[in-house]
Amino acid sequence: MWIGIISLFPEMFRAITDYGVTGRAVKNGLLSIESWSPRDFAHDRHRTVDDRPYGGGPGMLMMVQPLRDAIHAAKAAAGEGAKVIYLSPQGRKLDQAGVSELATNQKLILVCGRYEGIDERVIQTEIDEEWSIGDYVLSGGELPAMTLIDSVSRFIPGVLGHEASATEDSFADGLLDCPHYTRPEVLEEMEVPPVLLSGNHAEIRRWRLKQSLGRTWLRRPELLENLALTEEQAKLLAQFKSEHAQQQHKHDGQA
């Protein structure tokens, strides 16, 4: 997969190219990341990249000419088929379904805004899609772009050490992940659930599914509204709710 970055601070992306899963993907040739700074396309000696907004108001906007030239350079390097994405609070909110959708593209160009944003005409003429990572404001689009790159790269074949890792991630099937445990078996009198030590893979699978369903019901119930539960899932969720109610009743009795 090839990803082009338009950013005033391309050095920030060393966090992606040099470390962790994405760093290994770059090293192994599974992910290629290039960057262009609008500052390199500025024509004045001060390398100006911001300009005042028409109509007044606080803050500045990214200057049109250097930004467009940087986008055009990235498009030329990418060749045909590159999708241009602007990271913006006004965009579609990124979720696992969106990540899976974006991962089908072989080439992405990510435009990272700064200041108060970019000229609307640049969005209309140069941008294919706008994406947001949440309903809050950041200083620029670099962190959202890194979030998108990290999540999308997990779908590239060979990037993860275990083939099932991406499919078992939280949200991969619309549910939150189940609890996980490692050594020691007992930590401050808290024991690993016995089923995980049983070696019974069928029961372990059922336990994990039940915990995943239950955790989603407790923490993100709206996610369940969009799912058509199987008969097994519905039964396991009912069991979890019953067990949870019993635990709550027991806890209330001890309080």
From Swiss-Prot:
According to its UniProt record, where is this protein located?
Cytoplasm
Q: How does the annotation summarize its subunit structure?
A: Homodimer.
Protein's recorded name: tRNA (guanine-N(1)-)-methyltransferase
**What protein family is recorded?**
Belongs to the RNA methyltransferase TrmD family.
Which keywords does this Swiss-Prot/TrEMBL entry list? Answer: Cytoplasm, Methyltransferase, S-adenosyl-L-methionine, Transferase, tRNA processing
Q: Which GO terms describe its cellular component?
A: cytosol
Q: Where does S-adenosyl-L-methionine bind?
A: 113, 133-138
Q: Name the domain of life this protein comes from.
A: Bacteria
| HAMAP family in the record | TrmD
What is the E.C. number? 2.1.1.228
Q: Which residues form a coiled coil?
A: none
Question: Which species expresses this protein natively?
Answer: Klebsiella pneumoniae (strain 342)
Encoding gene per record:
trmD
The disulfides recorded in the entry are none
Q: Which GO terms describe its biological process?
A: tRNA N1-guanine methylation
Chief location bin: cytoplasm
Any one Gene Ontology molecular-function term assigned to this protein's record: tRNA (guanine(37)-N1)-methyltransferase activity
- Describe its function: Specifically methylates guanosine-37 in various tRNAs.
Pfam family, any one: tRNA_m1G_MT
Catalytic reaction list: guanosine(37) in tRNA + S-adenosyl-L-methionine = N(1)-methylguanosine(37) in tRNA + S-adenosyl-L-homocysteine + H(+)
